[in-house]
């Protein structure tokens, strides 16, 4: 089958993917001397590891939908054979020549997850190819729909509709409930995956794809559309980022401060300030 071809390619790309990029420290989310699981991992090296793992598992690619395996009649909902379904020709895709790369390809891309160090996995592990496949689909949509933040937010809220039913738990499932579901095959929290994708773009170095206020507004719209689902997920992300400020890149610390102030201004500055009171008590005497 086709399995031999990607395996041969992976052998050739291993030396490139395993070599650290000369500029990786310039775009690292956290200080390179700190052992931070959430960042500092090159997307290229991650994908190399993920693809090798997937090859060993027979290319299951569990997160990819397979609609042709469950074809049903629109009126009777009865199963239909795939051969009887009306085929639609795929349009020709024209790739511009030459492709304008711009400035971004000069720097490597690192994978950031604000949910990487939790006691329970609510987002795909970085060793799982699903983390790259789902993140890629979400990031592409976020950056391509920059002209309509509301449509972007609605898409992020409904991401479970675009993947197999076993991929995600029901929206707004409590975090404590995730502990009970922990096992060999555990579905992920769709709102965590969505928030993770937005933060990966908001904290992209050296610069984000769009103006930072766009990503601010997407998170705000998500909270307005599904507050019961997004608010708890966003709260855990905020706590992680706050606790990581000492090791975070200074530019990203400023971005976090700007976003947090902007976000709270839309919701009456409501936050559990008592959580941080003890840590910052020394500043109250100034």
Go through each PLM region and give its residues.
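Eukaryotic alpha-helical solenoid repeat scaffolds
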Residues: 1-286
